[in-house]
From Swiss-Prot:
Sequence similarity: Belongs to the amidase family. GatA subfamily.
Protein name, as recorded: Glutamyl-tRNA(Gln) amidotransferase subunit A
GO CC field: glutamyl-tRNA(Gln) amidotransferase complex
Gene this chain is encoded by: gatA
Catalytic activities: L-glutamyl-tRNA(Gln) + L-glutamine + ATP + H2O = L-glutaminyl-tRNA(Gln) + L-glutamate + ADP + phosphate + H(+)
Function: Allows the formation of correctly charged Gln-tRNA(Gln) through the transamidation of misacylated Glu-tRNA(Gln) in organisms which lack glutaminyl-tRNA synthetase. The reaction takes place in the presence of glutamine and ATP through an activated gamma-phospho-Glu-tRNA(Gln).
GO molecular function, a single term: ATP binding
GO biological process, one term: translation
UniProt EC number: 6.3.5.7
Keywords of the record: ATP-binding, Ligase, Nucleotide-binding, Protein biosynthesis
PROSITE patterns to which the protein is assigned, alphabetical: AMIDASES
UniProt source species: Mycolicibacterium gilvum (strain PYR-GCK)
C-alpha cells in the first residue's frame, strides 16, 4: 500500500501544488489500491482509469508551467456516486434498467469537479436509485464494509463511504435523500455532509425523490469535506430548485473550528433522538461521551424537544415513495436503457410492463407501489396530504429549536453496521435505520456525520450527527472540526 493514499486531501493538494508529488502519481496510487482491494469491497461499479490519469496530467502540466490552479483540490482524485451523469462513464444508478447507459451530458456536479481539476476515479456502488440503507439493493451486488466485510457500509451511498474507508479515494461525492450520505459515513468512520437543500445542483442527478434529494461531499476529515463542499455548492440556473444565496464559507469555519474553542456556541441535544427502543448501548455511550467533549470545549449544551420527530418516519415513507412513483415512470424502455419483450409480439404497453418488471429490483417495485397507492384518488388526502402536513410541523419544530440553539446533535444511526442479509427481508427494520437522519431531509436543513469513535459493544464505528438551519452549513463545519480536533486520531479500517 502506497503511503500517499493514507494522506488527507488537503495534504495531497499541497504536495501536488508544490511539485513534491504529481497528480498522476497520486491518482495512480489510488487506482492501484482500487485494483488491489475492490474485489473484497465492491465499492466501484465503473473505474475510469484512463480519464482520471488524463485529468491528472492536465493538472501536472499546469503546475509545471506555474499556472494558477483551478481550485484548492486540483489534482486530488475523487470517487463519484453512480447517480450523477457522466459522458465518459456509464450511469446505472445501481439498476439493471440503466445497465450500460452513458449520458449525453454531465451533471452540474460532475462539470464542477472537472472544472476544479479533480480527477474522477470512477463511479461508486449504491442501492438501486438510492433506495435503501445498506447498498444491498444494488443490481450489481452489495458493497462490503471495510471495517468488517460481513457487514454493510450503509446506504444508499455505501460505495462512496467504503471507498474512503478502504483508502481507494481521498474524496467522494454522495447524495442524501433520507440519510444516504450521513448514515454510511457513520458506519465507516468517515465524514459526510448533507448540504442545505437547493445549495448543490441536482441537474444531472437522477432523481429518487425530488424534494428530498441533495448531493453532498464525503471525505476522511472535516476540512477535506469543507474543501469539496466549496467546489460543488452554488446556484445553478439549470436546476429549478437551486437556491440563489451565497455559499457559506465552510472552509473558514472548519479552520476556525479546528482551534477547538466552542465558547458561546449553543448546542441542543434532540430529546427524541437520544434514547429509546432500538438504540444500541455502545452508540449511546459514544454519543454521550461526544456531548461531554463538546461541553468541555466551551459549548452550552441543553436538551431540545422536537415532538413531531416521532412522526417523521411514516411521513417520510409516504412522501418519498409518492415522488418515486412519479420520477421512475420515465423508465419504460421506450427512450433509453433496458428494453424487454421487444420481439415484435408485444404491444408498447406490454413492452413497458416487461421492461419495468425485469429492470427494477424488489425494493424499487415496493416503493413504486406504495407511492402509487398513496397518490391514488381515494387515498391522496388520507396519506400523502397528511404526510406533507407532518413535514411542515417537523420544519416548525426545527425552526423553534434554532431560536434557542445554534446547532442540534444526535447519534447519526441507532446502531453500528448490521450484518449483510440481516434486514433484507424486513423492510420496516431497514426503514427504522434512517430514524435519526431523515427529519433534516423533510425540512431541507443541513447535517453532518463525524466519527465519534468505536462502539464498546462491537468495536465498530459510530457517528455523531450535527444539524444546523438552512443556509447555515458553516456551523456544521465549525462544530465538527472542533470536535474532531478534540477527539484526536481514530483507528482506520485498514
Amino acid at each position: 500500500m502506497s503511503e500517499l493514499i493514507k494522506l488527507d486531501a488537503a495534504t495531497l493538494a499541497d504536495k501536488i501544488s508544490s511539485k513534491e508529488v504529481s497528480s498522476a502519481e497520486v491518482t495512480q496510487a489510488f487506482l492501484d489500491q482500487i485494483a488491489a482491494t475492490d474485489g473484497d469491497y465492491h465499492a466501484f461499479l465503473h473505474v475510469g482509469a484512463e480519464q482520471a490519469l488524463a485529468a491528472a496530467q492536465t493538472v501536472d502540466r499546469a503546475v509545471a508551467a506555474g499556472e494558477h490552479l483551478p481550485s484548492p483540490l486540483a489534482g486530488v482524485p475523487l470517487a463519484l456516486k453512480d447517480v450523477f451523469t457522466t459522458t465518459d462513464m456509464p450511469t446505472t444508478c445501481g439498476s439493471k434498467v440503466l445497465e450500460g447507459w452513458t449520458s449525453p451530458y454531465d451533471a452540474t456536479v460532475t462539470a464542477k469537479l472537472r472544472s476544479a481539476g479533480i480527477p474522477i476515479l470512477g463511479k461508486t456502488n449504491m442501492d438501486e436509485f438510492a433506495m435503501g440503507s445498506s447498498t444491498e439493493n444494488s443490481a450489481y451486488g452489495p458493497t462490503r464494509n471495510p471495517w468488517d466485510t460481513e457487514r454493510v457500509p450503509g446506504g444508499s451511498g455505501g460505495g462512496s463511504a467504503a471507498a474512503l474507508a478502504a483508502f481507494q479515494a481521498p474524496l467522494a461525492i454522495g447524495t442524501d435523500t433520507g440519510g444516504s450520505i450521513r448514515q454510511p459515513a457513520a458506519l465507516t468512520a468517515t465524514v459526510g455532509v448533507k448540504p442545505t437543500y437547493g445549495t448543490v445542483s441536482r441537474y444531472g442527478l437522477v432523481a429518487c425523490a425530488s424534494s428530498l434529494d441533495q448531493g453532498g461531499p464525503c471525505a476522511r476529515t472535516v476540512l477535506d469535506t469543507a474543501l469539496l463542499h466549496q467546489v460543488i455548492a452554488g446556484h445553478d440556473p439549470l436546476d429549478s430548485t437551486s437556491v440563489e444565496a451565497p455559499v457559506p464559507d465552510v472552509v473558514a469555519a472548519a479552520r476556525t473550528g479546528a482551534g477547538g474553542d466552542l465558547t458561546g456556541v449553543r448546542i441542543g441535544v434532540v430529546k427524541q433522538l437520544r434514547s429509546g427502543e432500538g438504540y444500541q448501548a455502545g452508540v449511546l455511550a459514544s454519543f454521550n461521551a461526544a456531548v461531554d467533549q463538546l461541553t468541555a470545549l466551551g459549548a452550552e449544551v441543553t436538551e431540545v424537544d422536537c415532538p413531531h420527530f416521532d412522526y417523521s418516519l411514516p411521513a417520510y415513507y409516504l412522501i418519498l415513495p409518492s415522488e418515486v412513483s412519479s420520477n421512475l415512470a420515465k423508465f419504460d424502455g421506450m427512450r433509453y436503457g433496458l428494453r424487454a419483450g421487444d420481439d415484435g409480439t408485444h404491444s408498447a404497453e406490454e413492452v413497458m410492463a416487461l421492461t419495468r418488471a425485469a429492470g427494477f429490483g424488489p425494493e424499487v417495485k415496493r416503493r413504486i407501489m406504495i407511492g402509487a397507492y398513496a397518490l391514488s384518488a381515494g387515498y391522496y388526502d388520507a396519506y400523502y396530504n397528511q404526510a406533507q402536513k407532518v413535514r411542515t410541523l417537523i420544519a416548525r419544530d426545527l425552526d423553534a429549536a434554532y431560536q434557542k440553539v445554534d446547532v442540534l446533535v444526535s447519534p447519526a444511526t441507532p446502531t453500528t453496521a448490521f450484518r449483510l442479509g440481516e434486514k433484507v427481508d424486513d423492510p420496516l427494520s431497514m426503514y427504522l435505520f434512517d430514524l435519526c437522519t431523515l427529519p433534516l431531509n423533510l425540512a431541507g436543513h443541513c447535517g453532518m456525520s463525524v466519527p465519534s469513535g468505536l462502539s464498546a459493544d462491537d468495536n465498530l464505528p459510530v457517528g455523531l450527527q450535527i444539524m444546523a438551519p438552512a443556509l447555515a452549513d458553516d456551523r456544521l463545519y465549525r462544530v465538527g472540526a472542533a470536535y474532531e480536533a478534540a477527539r484526536g486520531p481514530l483507528p482506520t479500517a485498514l
